[in-house]
Amino acid sequence: MLQNIGLKITQIYKFPMVEKKNIFLNGLIDLAQSRLGSKIIYKTDEFFAPAKRIINPWPPVFKEGVFDKNGKWMDGWETRRKRSKGHDYLILKLGRPGKIHKVDIDTSYFSGNQPSKVSLEACFSKKKTPGKNLKWITILKKIPTKPNSHHYFNIKNKSIFSHIKLNIFPDGGVARLRIYGSMIVKKRFGKKTLNLTSVLNGATPIVCNNEHFGRAENILAPGTGKNMGDGWETRRSRGKNFDWLIIKCAAPGKINKIQIDTHHFKGNYPDKCSLQAAYITKKVSSKSIIGKSTNWKFLLNNVKLYANRKHNFRNKLMKNQKINYIKINIFPDGGISRIRAFGKAE
């Protein structure tokens, strides 16, 4: 059984409140990101910048004075100036179908060349390319865009979608398209050991206190982190605080191995970390789970971390307890590339 031993967090550290900017946690992930298998399958034009950049999971950048053969290099999708009727659009196939809750149409660094307006349509198809007779549903009506801005919108239609169409009127550039939602995963895991904190298996980030330099959902992504930006990283802590992230596992299960990967984090990795866990059967809100998590049992006691390394823990784990939520505490702050919790689903 898990034992409530180790560092008594609430007695030593102040418990930081959730920052208001964490608006896309609560189990939502970016369904459009390329590392989940999402692909651009059609675009009317990409003269100035290729459409595939719009689903890059990392934030857009601006390269001062950099030009390619067609003009200024831009980190996003940019079409040529339209000299005829109509508008430009692209079609995105999601890596996994899902229910869409929120979107962000990001025009960062596009100023004077952003679209006048944009809209979104969606459909469900088992084929790579939707048929011509398939009906597209408007999920975001035509709205004006601003230069160098994030455009956040809630999506009311909670149908399952597999394809997204981004319309830009009449032309222009968009840095990133974020489709935040819940992935539909066929959870037929059997008796094999799997990573219960992998987003591809259905794990989701619920709430964290900070993600200033790196998004919390990165920690659940497949594969090895590409760089320091491909991980969860918090701001520098000033005081007796610690940072934390709560994850809902892909399925309830018993954990037999934990891997904490600090790849690329060399001068900014956490000094120590601990893991708490719980098995919760009732539906709980992100707000209520924060307070309850302080009393969760310790899955992994306070352990030392090192730079740019995969830390594997077996013997130090408190085993033989079914869990479906994990809370990772990092002391006092810093960055982690991936967390992998291996076990069998039950």
PLM-predicted stretches and their roles:
Residues 90-92, 101:
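General structural concept
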Residues 94, 249-251:
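A short glycine/threonine-centered beta-strand motif
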Residues 1-16:
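N-terminal amphipathic/basic-hydrophobic helices that include classical n-h-c signal peptides
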Residues 12-89, 109-244, 253-254, 264-346:
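Trp- and acidic/polar-enriched beta-sheet ligand-binding modules for extracellular glycan
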